[in-house]
Design a protein with these regions (language model features):
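Walker A/P-loop NTP-binding motif
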Residues: 61, 81-95, 116-118
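Walker A/P-loop
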Residues: 66-87
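Conserved beta-strand -> loop -> alpha-helix junction used to position metal-binding or nucleic-acid-contacting
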Residues: 102-107, 124-137, 230-242, 254-263
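A contiguous, basic/glycine-rich beta-loop/short-helix subdomain that forms a polymer-engagement track
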Residues: 180-203, 216-224, 315-358
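Conserved helicase NTPase motor core
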Residues: 203-210, 214-254, 353-357
């Protein structure tokens, strides 16, 4: 091909230099991390294999070459976690993948995975356990978490003043939750945002299944700089629970009681009556629903009409959302999503009440 040199004028050149200065340290860090991974010594998951474990290792390696999706089933206590982790680490080391995501819906499962990982690789491999916003939350003179995304949008100047480089935050192969909270409190930064900023620098991500299978949470992983699904090994522990977890994540639930609490908070904050009226009526209608019943056609269209009315009001009115509790904001913005579900084809959604008033 032809190589062409294009001169850049001064303003664009300055922008180009700033972007280059931001990218080069990250790319150098990733190269160093991959080189360290290739050279590190990975210990076997078990010093002495028990009956069936050697066969499982062989079968897993063969199956992974033949198919993109592999289902592994073995009795509790068999040693699945260790065998799967060893498979993952060996393939990361060989460059078959450049990242591994390990999902478990149980915190005990995540902690057991971390314990096994440290025993096999010590501090040579960077990993990050992505905890939820509530666990990251702090209430200090410098920063108070709002438990929603507003909390993350801190001034860029605060980050520059703190001189924080995410790749340098790792200690003993990871960035602990308590370290994130300490740094956040000292510098007025959101601990959750600090942990998220470290994701591009970690070789292994450990977290809840929602970080991949929930539309509300998956952006944390999917939108991370440098993430490439085609070069990522995904491991789902306790995968038999996945259908239920996915249904919970994809479903939209509104409680009459929660709506009433939200109504009171919005009324006190001065929300206009034309917005409060359909919100109150929606709460009243939902309160009449009985457990384990599908919605009648009349109820379906009534709820749809109310939800669409509320959605329209949200677009027209002016509310200082920062002045109301985060749960109110989250609940109100759930209504437009419910409107879309109610308006969709019945084949796409089950419209029913799991319990009284829900």
């Amino acid at each position: 091909g032809t190589v062409q040199t294009v001169e850049i004028d001064t303003p664009k050149a300055d922008m180009f230099e700033r972007q280059l200065n931001a990218m080069i340290p990250f790319l150098q860090d990733r190269r160093n991390s991959l080189n360290a991974l290739k050279e590190c010594s990975i210990k076997p998951a078990y010093k002495k294999l028990r009956g069936g474990q050697a066969q499982l290792q062989t079968t897993l390696n063969k199956s992974a070459l033949q198919a993109k999706t592999v289902l592994l089933e073995a009795p509790t206590g068999f040693g699945k976690t260790g065998i799967v982790l060893e498979h993952a680490l060996r393939h990361l080391q060989l460059g078959v993948y450049n990242r591994c995501i390990y999902l478990s819906s149980k915190s005990t499962g995540q902690l057991e995975t971390i314990k096994q990982l440290r025993a096999m690789s010590a501090d040579a491999i960077r990993y990050l356990q992505m905890r939820n916003r509530k666990e990251h939350s702090i209430d200090t003179p410098t920063h108070t978490c709002s438990t929603d995304k507003q909390c993350e949008h801190t001034s860029a100047q605060l980050w520059r003043d703190a001189d924080i480089h995410p790749g340098k935050l790792f200690e003993r192969g990871t960035f602990e939750l308590e370290n994130a909270k300490d740094i956040g409190a000292k510098n007025g930064l959101c601990p959750y945002a600090l942990t998220k900023s470290c994701l591009p620098y970690a070789d292994i991500w450990i977290g809840d299944t929602n970080y991949v299978f929930s539309p509300q949470s998956r952006g944390v992983f999917i939108d991370t700089i440098g993430f490439d699904p085609s070069q990522t090994l995904l491991i789902v522990d306790e995968a038999h629970n996945l259908p239920q977890r996915a249904a919970e994540a994809l479903g939209i639930e509104l409680s009459a009681t929660e709506l009433l609490f939200a109504y009171e908070e919005l009324r006190v904050s001065g929300a206009p009556r034309r917005f409060l009226r359909p919100l109150e009526e929606l709460s009243t209608r939902i309160n009449t629903l009985r457990a384990d019943q599908t919605l009648s056609s009349n109820t379906h269209y009534t709820l749809l009409d109310l939800c669409e009315d509320i959605e329209q009001q949200i677009a027209q009115i002016h509310i200082h959302w920062n002045s109301v509790p985060p749960f109110v904001t989250e609940l109100v913005w759930r209504v437009p999503s419910l409107a879309k579900c109610l308006a969709a084809s019945p084949q796409k959604w089950l419209h029913w009440s799991p319990s009284n008033g829900v």
